[in-house]
């Protein structure tokens, strides 16, 4: 049985999945890091794969850009395919002066300007947060590396190009470390469906300072984040 957006058999996915936004990055991760890889879905070009990492079955799949797109895949993976552990691996833009290019943010929670949670949570504000055990594993793993990391809140925006950039100053005052587009949707879907989720975001741009990583720098830093995510996946309990 498949879903409208995933054409995979029910047993196609592992209990733990890594999810970048870009389906081609999912393909790169699968082909670079996993063994015995099988492509399990390709509807609308949103590629998904399952393979093995150091003997553990792990899946990787893209989720697209923005909360509406990502929420479709989160929901179908959680409800139909019974995936339990979600690790988002993505990029973000920094807005806080203490956050630098190449920093890795472990997202405790995610504020948002999206109305999706107002619909989901009966017009109330839902505090979308990571699973504590997964968050702890991320921090413990990062402590063994040379990666400069921060743990705190991010902001999930429906707009990539905002017309009101002065809002970034307000977000920084509240301690928001970075801006991206999907973490709030992931944490909310995980809470709704009793799943576990954590998000890792590499700082590839500094919105306030107008600094950006080069293409080569992005590739290197994202690979470091992927290694962390895979190490965390190995430490999670199996179903």
From Swiss-Prot:
This is Purine nucleoside phosphorylase DeoD-type. A purine D-ribonucleoside binds at residues 5, 180-182, 204-205. The active site is at residue 205. One of its GO terms (biological process) is purine nucleoside catabolic process. Phosphate binds at residues 21, 25, 44, 88-91. It catalyses: a purine D-ribonucleoside + phosphate = a purine nucleobase + alpha-D-ribose 1-phosphate; a purine 2'-deoxy-D-ribonucleoside + phosphate = a purine nucleobase + 2-deoxy-alpha-D-ribose 1-phosphate. CDD domains: PNP_EcPNPI-like. Gene3D superfamilies: Nucleoside phosphorylase domain. It comes from Aliivibrio fischeri (strain ATCC 700601 / ES114). Belongs to the PNP/UDP phosphorylase family. InterPro entries: DeoD-type (IPR004402), Nucleoside_phosphorylase_CS (IPR018016), Nucleoside_phosphorylase_d (IPR000845), Nucleoside_phosphorylase_sf (IPR035994). Pfam families: PNP_UDP_1. Homohexamer; trimer of homodimers. Catalyzes the reversible phosphorolytic breakdown of the N-glycosidic bond in the beta-(deoxy)ribonucleoside molecules, with the formation of the corresponding free purine bases and pentose-1-phosphate. Keywords: Glycosyltransferase, Transferase. The record marks 218 as: Important for catalytic activity. It comes from the Bacteria. Disulfide bonds: none annotated. GO terms for molecular function: purine-nucleoside phosphorylase activity. One of its GO terms (cellular component) is cytosol. Its EC number is 2.4.2.1. Signal peptide: none annotated.
């Amino acid at each position: 049985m498949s879903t409208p957006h995933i054409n995979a058999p029910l047993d196609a996915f592992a209990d733990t999945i890594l999810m970048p936004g870009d389906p081609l990055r999912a393909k790169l991760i699968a082909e670079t890091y996993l063994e015995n890889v099988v492509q399990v879905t390709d509807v609308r070009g949103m590629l998904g794969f399952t393979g093995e990492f150091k003997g553990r079955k792990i899946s990787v799949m893209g989720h697209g850009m923005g909360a509406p797109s990502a929420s479709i895949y989160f929901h179908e993976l959680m409800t139909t395919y019974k995936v339990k552990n979600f690790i988002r691996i993505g990029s973000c833009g920094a807005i806080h002066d203490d956050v630098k290019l190449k920093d890795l943010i472990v997202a405790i929670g995610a504020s948002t300007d999206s109305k999706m949670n107002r619909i989901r949570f009966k017009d109330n504000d839902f505090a979308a947060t990571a699973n504590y055990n997964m968050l702890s594993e991320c921090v413990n793993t990062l402590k063994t590396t040379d990666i400069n990391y921060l743990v705190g809140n991010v902001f999930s925006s429906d707009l990539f190009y905002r017309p009101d950039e002065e809002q970034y100053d307000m977000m920084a005052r509240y301690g928001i470390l970075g801006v991206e587009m999907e973490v709030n949707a992931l944490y909310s879907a995980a809470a709704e469906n009793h799943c576990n989720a954590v998000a890792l975001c590499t700082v590839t741009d500094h919105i306030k300072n107008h600094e950006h990583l080069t293409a080569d720098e992005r590739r290197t830093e994202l690979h470091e984040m992927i290694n962390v995510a895979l190490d965390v996946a190995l430490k999670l309990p199996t179903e």
